[in-house]
């Protein structure tokens, strides 16, 4: 019979079975207290195994639910405070309730009685267990002879299973399962399975040992042959060739190469070992092996995916470009989430590196290359830049075959060797300027490089073996994305870099360009002061660009002249104001267009956009006696000429409505001119300005001078959307115009313009040319239509008089 409650003594790493007599060492307070309680009562102690042996003070949840009830036979206290007890186990016990008394644990439980199985089955299992046990002893499992014989002589099936489980090196969980199994047949079967697994493990170990022995024998044989070869090589070529081969061999053994690569490289190394070091082919193989051992096959940097740090770096190095920064941070956020899921085993590790190839699109000097460098710094990766401008040979990407003299790997492999890691940020600059020739299409070669489904096994012609590019973060840049072949462009995600506004250029000049140029020209900040007004005039009158490269050059020129003044005139401080610029840099190089001073007949203010920014332009129309010819000047492109013809057709169609005599078109020549004739002009966006100027010239109604317009037109009078809204509006603002006509469908594009720059400006969004003429002409559309009505009335009266 079991007591109502029993003190619990947790044990670590072992399981006790009924009928066993064994000593227990107890050093933990929770165990010593339990033993004291048992001795004070009926000397019955419940011994239970811990699930985790690292837990120092176990609670009920840390213990298994089946233990062994034991009688304490003897107890001895040690000088260090620990105790040793001799116990005899007498029953399996399943705990029904735990009692946590603070300084020790107690439990209420019930005896887990043996369930005898089918006699024939039990007898067979007993025989099998003893056979496997003996087989293990023969395989070298050491047990004291008297212990082994005692186990083999056991007749009780229950005790046989328990004693075998106790003396074998089974896992704690397996031993506990044997303790928890009440059915004797099932318990024997569980022990039999464990014995067979142990025998299988021993057989596997024996097979491994045999393989290792054979490998050692083969290595010894190879070593012997290699030493013979070395001796022959020394006789033929001296010590230098042998040392070189050994050096390559040591480096290759230190590399964790894929099997296919190792096989090919060892073949080349063996060929090299048999050659004279000074032969031409040996030189080719030597260069090849040098490339192989210096490539980062498994060297990588650990990604730093701290978004706050990345944001700080982007803000530190670049002003503006908010959309670009947001997209870069989104890209890093996705990589971080993927990396966390891969660590949890939810997605394969290869999925982490899969993602869009970023394509930075924009005019020169707007920060495409520098932001790629900032991304590398934010990620903690190496940075490599390869310029593809003018590349016309496929071998520049894939490498040259080794049959050619002076063959080298392609730029991709060269860049990876330069980086020293297999996961750098790799910038492919000017990808839109790739050429094509009889030597192949490098853009087609890039398809394999940039395709995540293929670049895991990119084969450079020079290497001749696959190299994994899947961990490389490729970023491309381009000025004109329309020049990129469609299959290549399809693999990229374009991110547009727009030209900087004047305000952005001013901030960039103050924060980055001026301090950098001061440092490069050996000046201290207190030696030269450039006023904000001077910088603004420098931007508007001495540069015309989308980025800030020319601006930095002009600042550099300004500071060099200031440095000369400091030395020649002995000045301690030079202050450069707006008025001083001409003395330092000469007369202004660019004079921005400004609004006309008063309304004029036949002159409308349009807007244009180039990669270096936007501005206004004047569309001039003159009507003169002639034969109905349309004259177009000002270097107009084909599309702009078509817009002019469409404007003329619209004017003819609405001639009576606007009071224009139809015969005027046949008896007059119409001359359309767009000033700055040396500059080519193209695009459909001047359509509304052409119509306004043309109708004004034909009706002699002036066009307002304080309003600028842009938009494509149709023959039916619809106004269609155009591009470059931000640059055009900023150009108009710079020219002093505060009222702008835009297509209705371009209304969302205003969000790209900074809010402070939209203030004090009026925007009219139109869908039809009637709305344009109502806004652009003095007096509006009503005055124009009234003129038409008067003209038609006068014509009818004239016809009636002539008829009478």
Swiss-Prot record:
Whichever gene encodes this chain, its name is lon2
Give the main location.
cytoplasm
Which terms does the UniProt entry file under GO BP? cellular response to heat; protein quality control for misfolded or incompletely synthesized proteins
- Limits of the Lon proteolytic domain: 598-779
In this protein, the active site sits at 685, 728
- Self-association and partners: Homohexamer. Organized in a ring with a central cavity.
**One Pfam family cited in the UniProt record for this chain:** LON_substr_bdg
Role of this protein: ATP-dependent serine protease that mediates the selective degradation of mutant and abnormal proteins as well as certain short-lived regulatory proteins. Required for cellular homeostasis and for survival from DNA damage and developmental changes induced by stress. Degrades polypeptides processively to yield small peptide fragments that are 5 to 10 amino acids long. Binds to DNA in a double-stranded, site-specific manner.
The residues that the entry says bind ATP are 362-369
- Protein name (record): Lon protease 2
The record's keywords, sorted A to Z, are: ATP-binding, Cytoplasm, Hydrolase, Nucleotide-binding, Protease, Serine protease, Stress response
Hey, which family's this protein in?
Answer: Belongs to the peptidase S16 family.
Q: What is its EC number?
A: 3.4.21.53
The cross-references to PANTHER family, in alphabetical order and at most eight, read: ATP DEPENDENT LON PROTEASE FAMILY MEMBER (PTHR10046)
Q: Which domain of life is it from?
A: Bacteria
* Compartmental location: Cytoplasm
Q: Which reaction does it catalyse?
A: Hydrolysis of proteins in presence of ATP
Reply yes or no: does the keyword Nucleotide-binding apply.
Answer: yes
Q: What class of enzyme is it?
A: hydrolase
Induction (UniProt): By heat shock.
Q: Cross-referenced SMART domains, in alphabetical order?
A: AAA, LON
Q: Which organism is it from?
A: Thermus thermophilus (strain ATCC BAA-163 / DSM 7039 / HB27)
């Amino acid at each position: 019979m079991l007591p109502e409650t029993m003190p619990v003594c947790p044990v670590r790493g072992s399981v006790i079975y009924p009928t066993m007599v064994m000593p227990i060492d107890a050093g933990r307070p929770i165990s010593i207290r339990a033993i004291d309680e048992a001795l004070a009562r009926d000397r019955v102690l419940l011994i239970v195994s811990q699930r985790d042996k690292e837990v120092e003070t176990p609670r009920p949840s840390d213990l298994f639910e089946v233990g062994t009830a034991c009688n304490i036979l003897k107890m001895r206290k040690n000088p260090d405070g620990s105790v040793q007890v001799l116990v005899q186990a007498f029953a399996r016990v399943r705990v029904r309730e735990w009692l946590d008394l603070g300084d020790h644990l107690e439990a209420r439980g019930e005896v887990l009685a043996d369930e005898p199985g089918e006699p024939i089955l039990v007898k067979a299992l007993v025989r099998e267990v003893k056979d496997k046990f003996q087989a293990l002893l023969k395989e070298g499992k050491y047990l004291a002879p008297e212990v082994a014989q005692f186990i083999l002589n056991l007749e009780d099936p229950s005790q046989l299973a328990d004693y075998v489980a106790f003396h074998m090196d089974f896992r704690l969980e397996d031993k506990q399962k044997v303790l928890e199994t009440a059915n004797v047949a099932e318990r024997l079967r569980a022990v039999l399975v464990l014995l067979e697994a142990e025998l299988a493990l021993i057989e596997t170990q024996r097979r491994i040992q045999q393989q290792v022995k054979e490998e050692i024998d083969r290595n010894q044989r190879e070593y012997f042959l290699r030493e013979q070869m070395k001796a022959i090589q020394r006789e033929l070529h001296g010590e230098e060739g042998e040392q070189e081969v050994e050096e390559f061999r040591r480096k290759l053994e230190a590399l964790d190469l894929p099997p296919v690569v190792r096989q090919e490289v060892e073949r080349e190394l063996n060929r090299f070992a048999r050659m004279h070091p000074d032969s031409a082919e040996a030189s080719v193989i030597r260069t090849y092996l040098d490339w192989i051992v210096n490539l980062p096959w498994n060297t990588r940097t650990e990604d730093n995916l701290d978004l706050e740090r990345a944001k700080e770096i982007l803000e530190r190095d670049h002003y503006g470009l908010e959309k670009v920064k947001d997209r870069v941070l989104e890209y890093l956020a996705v990589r971080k989430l993927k990396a966390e899921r891969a660590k949890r085993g939810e997605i394969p590790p290869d999925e982490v590196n899969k993602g869009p190839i970023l394509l930075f699109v924009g005019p020169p000097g707007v920060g495409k290359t520098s932001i790629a460098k900032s991304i590398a710094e934010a990620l903690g990766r190496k940075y490599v830049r390869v310029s593809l401008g003018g590349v016309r040979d496929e071998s520049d990407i894939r490498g040259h075959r080794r049959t050619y003299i002076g063959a080298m790997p392609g730029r991709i492999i060269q860049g990876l060797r330069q980086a020293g890691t297999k996961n750098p940020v790799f910038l492919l600059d000017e990808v839109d300027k790739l050429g094509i020739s009889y030597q192949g299409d490098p853009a087609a070669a890039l398809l394999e490089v940039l395709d995540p489904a293929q670049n895991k096994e990119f084969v450079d012609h020079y290497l001749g073996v696959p190299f994994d590019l899947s961990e490389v973060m490729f970023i491309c840049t381009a000025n004109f994305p329309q020049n990129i072949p469609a299959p290549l462009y399809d693999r990229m995600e374009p991110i547009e870099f727009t030209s900087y506004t004047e305000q952005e250029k001013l901030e960039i000049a103050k924060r980055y360009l001026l301090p950098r140029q001061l440092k490069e020209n050996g000046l201290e900040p207190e030696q030269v002061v450039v006023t904000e007004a001077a910088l603004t005039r420098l931007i508007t009158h001495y540069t015309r660009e989308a980025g800030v490269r020319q601006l930095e050059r002009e600042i550099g020129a300004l500071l060099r002249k200031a440095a000369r003044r400091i030395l020649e005139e002995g000045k301690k401080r030079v202050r450069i104001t707006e008025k001083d610029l001409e003395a330092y840099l000469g007369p202004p190089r660019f004079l921005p267009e400004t609004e006309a001073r008063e309304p004029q007949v036949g002159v409308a203010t349009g807007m244009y956009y180039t990669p270096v920014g936007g501005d206004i332009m004047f569309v001039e129309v003159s009507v003169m006696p002639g034969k109905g010819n349309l004259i177009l000047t000002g270097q107009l492109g084909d599309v702009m000429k078509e817009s002019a013809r469409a404007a003329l057709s619209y004017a003819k169609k609405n001639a009576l409505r606007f009071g224009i005599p139809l015969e005027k078109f046949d008896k007059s020549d119409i001359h359309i001119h767009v000033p700055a004739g040396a500059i080519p002009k193209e695009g459909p966006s001047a359509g509304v300005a052409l119509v306004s100027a043309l109708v004004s010239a034909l009706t002699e109604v002036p066009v307002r001078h304080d309003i600028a317009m842009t938009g494509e037109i149709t023959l039916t009078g619809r106004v269609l959307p155009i591009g470059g809204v931000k640059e055009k509006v900023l150009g108009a603002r710079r020219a002093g115009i505060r009222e702008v006509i835009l297509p209705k469908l371009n209304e969302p594009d205003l969000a790209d313009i900074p809010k402070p720059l939209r203030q004090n400006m009026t925007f009219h969004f139109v869908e039809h040319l009637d709305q344009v003429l109502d806004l652009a002409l003095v007096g509006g559309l009503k005055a124009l239509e009234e003129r038409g009505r008067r003209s038609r009335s006068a014509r009818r009266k004239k016809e009636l008089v002539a008829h009478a």
